[in-house]
């Protein structure tokens, strides 16, 4: 199933085409224009890179937050607008859940965090093993100190590394830096992206 996916939950925006767990094309922009200005040209570029036409697309996926209210609204509106003429199926994917797919090939405990200000983060925690992602808690807003205490207990009860991912990493990590077994993700796979949204959406489409 060829899926066109959109990610607009933060200042950067991205689009991707995925099929059967493979990324066919990916585009990313982080310039001082609104998502409403950049999204459609970016989608055209992504389809061109994948050597596809829109008629080849079989499903649309979009991140649904948490994140920027304006960005999420633009992304969802674009997804609905693209899907409606062909009656394509749509999948709304949690921004936090999609980031777990950045590490789908790494056995670890994945802690996704997005800055919610006032020493809080939007958060979800996942157990990843042999490519299977298991959610350990629902998406939530939580104080950084409380999350650090939770991860301390998790770290004590697993042999896996606990990896911090997301744009809230630098906000949260000082609260957890002294906990054994916790590390920050690298910059190259730290942030939300449309390719991971598409990979996560495939699971939603497969489940009906």
Q: What kind of region is each of these model predictions?
A:
Residues 19-23, 76-88, 128-131, 181:
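A glycine- and small-aliphatic-rich helix-loop capping segment at beta-alpha/alpha-beta transitions
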Residues 61-90, 95:
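DPxDG-like acidic metal-binding loop motif
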